[in-house]
């Protein structure tokens, strides 16, 4: 973490934070979340299991969208915790486009998840749709559920952004790379009057598709 801070204030402010979010105790699946500090844009990707191989697969999916050059443009610094799912430092760093003599992947100090507090705080918004302790089965989640959830989360105006939305701010900051990433994961703009940050949003969409409830 000291090396992360040594990047300087501007680089730290422009970094990403990476974490995982768990569902019910009996689930194998979990979510990989990536938060872009400047825009507050958060992605949530489904992992079949909370392990380093699944994290690498998810980041590989992002790399397939952006390409090697795009990964280097977008993910200049990523801060995560010391969870076992992030233990394959070499694989993650390579996927981020880390070159010889540089570092793009950084770790919080042990037991200091507050050092990536923006990601943790934004999980509050995600948990409005997927509340903890409600018995929701992440093993049943589909990419369409996450696309819907993150479209709503990232369309909520934020005071820190001058009441713009994370999705709009992200596109303004990262242009075509941002548009490609959001399109690939189905994250679109939701009008203010249509915002729904309640568990019913996903359950209604699942019912319309004929999918079983999450709980």
Residue ranges and their predicted role:
Residues 69-74, 100-102:
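Short helix-terminating capping/connector loops at secondary-structure junctions
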Residues 36-37:
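Short, acidic, Ser/Thr-enriched surface-loop or helix-capping motifs
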């Amino acid at each position: 973490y000291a090396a992360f801070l040594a990047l300087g204030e501007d680089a730290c402010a422009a970094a990403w934070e990476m974490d995982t979010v768990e569902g019910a105790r009996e689930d194998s699946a979990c979510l990989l979340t990536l938060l872009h500090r400047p825009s507050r844009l958060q992605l949530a990707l489904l992992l079949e299991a909370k392990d380093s191989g699944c994290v690498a697969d998810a980041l590989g999916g992002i790399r397939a969208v952006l390409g090697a050059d795009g990964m280097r443009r977008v993910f200049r610094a990523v801060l995560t915790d010391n969870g076992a799912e992030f233990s394959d430092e070499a694989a993650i760093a390579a996927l981020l486009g880390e070159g010889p003599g540089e570092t793009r992947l950084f770790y919080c100090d042990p037991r200091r998840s507050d050092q990536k507090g923006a990601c943790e705080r934004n999980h509050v918004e995600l948990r409005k749709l997927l509340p903890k302790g409600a018995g929701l089965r992440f093993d049943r989640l589909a990419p369409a559920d996450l696309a819907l959830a993150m479209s709503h989360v990232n369309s909520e105006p934020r005071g820190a952004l001058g009441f713009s939305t994370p999705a709009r701010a992200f596109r303004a900051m990262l242009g075509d790379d941002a548009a490609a990433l959001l399109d690939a994961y189905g994250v679109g703009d939701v009008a203010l009057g249509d915002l729904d940050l309640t568990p019913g949003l996903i359950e209604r969409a699942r019912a319309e598709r004929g999918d079983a409830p999450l709980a």
